[in-house]
């Protein structure tokens, strides 16, 4: 790693267990793979938000979470959660021709089809929560304006990373097996087409993100207490890895990196590299003025024209700017505005939908 500590298979196993912890709230989905013992390891424990969400409002079961905490949770859902969903509805009304109060159509346009005709903003929020397993951090992706973290009380928002135990669970994932200091085996219960991609986990330094005194593979200790990733989260603002550059600091919209002298291929020749947060409109101008060395603007006709105007030879490669392009395999799609393309001013009518289908067929 960039601090000179050698990498071993324990770092890989630690990283996998973090990604498979019931309270993990990041974007990786290794836990969804059919790995032997995964279900048994994750059973009997979940985040408090998922537990309360699935328990439901008005529950009288206070054996795991007390009544006051449950009430505070649902009060937050009925206030901040509803506001979060209402912003989506309002956005769809303002921009997509959805009728005022038509939550069902607004939700469908946002990717949540199947709500009842008389659906409310709360119903939409519950649908969003179900999609993301009540992971408030992941639900932020659905925002139409406000951050969910600004709409929910901090203690309620934190329930999506706080563990609750309500049953028995296995102490380890039997399919994750250490076979040596630099080797391991992962056992699947069935064929998984995506396994080859999911197993490519980023190897995080256990001695930094975890706690070394809590790692003992033979005794089912994997660098942290199951259900408690607080130490992992506490150092994520100062990341450490094993790449060619190491993180120095982030301030004023700039990430500062410096060469990693411990990099396995040798230290990079460029000692310092800075990444700047940039708006699309500032990228090309930054290169022209010299505040940015390299950037990746959207390669539109306007950008091409602007580059050619800056170069004295009127080409994409000249005395001021050099352009490197690559071919990408991909696909795109066209969208049709229901506000602009409809029959009789009613974007939601069957005739309007058929018109748009006809144009797209």
Short names for language-model regions:
Residues 1-25, 81, 162, 172, ...:
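Extracytoplasmic/periplasmic ligand-capture domains
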Residues 1-148, 286, 348-358:
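Aromatic- and charge-enriched surface segment that lines or borders ligand/interaction sites
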Residues 2, 192-195:
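Primarily extracytoplasmic ectodomains and periplasmic/lumenal surface modules that are beta-strand-rich
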Residues 40-43, 229-235, 294, 302-304:
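A general structural signal for short secondary-structure boundary/capping elements
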Residues 42-56, 216-220, 236-238, 341-343:
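Short, charged low-complexity intrinsically disordered segments located at boundaries
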Residues 53-65, 163-176:
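Extracellular adhesion/glycan-binding regions together with long Ser/Thr-
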Residues 141-174, 180-183, 187-192, 200-268, ...:
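Gly/Pro-rich hinge or "lid" segments in bacterial periplasmic/extracellular proteins
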Residues 197-198, 347:
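Short conserved micro-motifs at the rims of enzyme active sites and ligand-binding pockets
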């Amino acid at each position: 790693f960039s601090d000179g500590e050698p990498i071993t298979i324990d770092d890989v196993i630690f990283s996998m267990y973090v990604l498979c912890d019931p309270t993990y709230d990041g974007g990786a989905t290794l836990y969804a793979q059919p790995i032997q013992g995964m279900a048994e390891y994750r059973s009997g424990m979940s985040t408090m938000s998922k537990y309360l969400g699935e328990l439901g409002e008005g529950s009288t079961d206070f054996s795991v979470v007390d009544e006051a905490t449950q009430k505070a949770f649902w009060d937050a859902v009925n206030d901040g959660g509803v506001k979060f969903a209402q912003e989506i509805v309002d956005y769809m009304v303002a921009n997509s021709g959805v009728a005022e109060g038509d939550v069902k159509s607004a939700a469908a346009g946002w990717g949540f089809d199947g709500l009842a005709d008389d659906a409310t903003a709360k119903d939409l929020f519950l649908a969003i929560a179900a999609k993301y397993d009540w992971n408030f951090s992941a639900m932020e992706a659905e925002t139409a304006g406000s951050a969910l973290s600004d709409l929910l009380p901090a203690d309620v928002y934190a329930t999506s990373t706080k563990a609750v135990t309500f049953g028995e669970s296995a102490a380890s994932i039997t399919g994750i097996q250490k076979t040596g200091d630099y080797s391991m085996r992962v056992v699947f219960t069935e064929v998984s087409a995506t396994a080859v991609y999911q197993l490519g986990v980023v190897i995080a330094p256990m001695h930094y993100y975890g706690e070394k005194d809590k790692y003992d593979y033979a005794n089912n200790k994997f660098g942290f207490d199951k259900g408690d990733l607080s130490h992992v989260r506490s150092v994520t603002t100062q990341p450490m890895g094993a790449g060619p550059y190491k993180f120095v600091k982030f301030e004023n919209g700039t990430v500062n990196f410096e060469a990693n002298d411990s990099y396995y291929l040798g230290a990079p020749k460029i000692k310092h590299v800075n990444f700047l947060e940039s708006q699309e409109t500032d990228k090309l101008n930054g290169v022209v003025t010299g505040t940015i060395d390299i950037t990746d603007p959207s390669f539109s006709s306007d950008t091409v024209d602007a580059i050619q105007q800056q170069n004295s030879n009127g080409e994409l490669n000249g005395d001021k700017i050099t352009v490197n392009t690559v071919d990408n395999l991909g696909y795109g799609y066209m969208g049709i505005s229901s506000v602009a393309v409809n029959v009789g001013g009613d974007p939601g009518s069957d005739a309007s939908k058929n018109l748009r289908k006809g144009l797209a067929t």
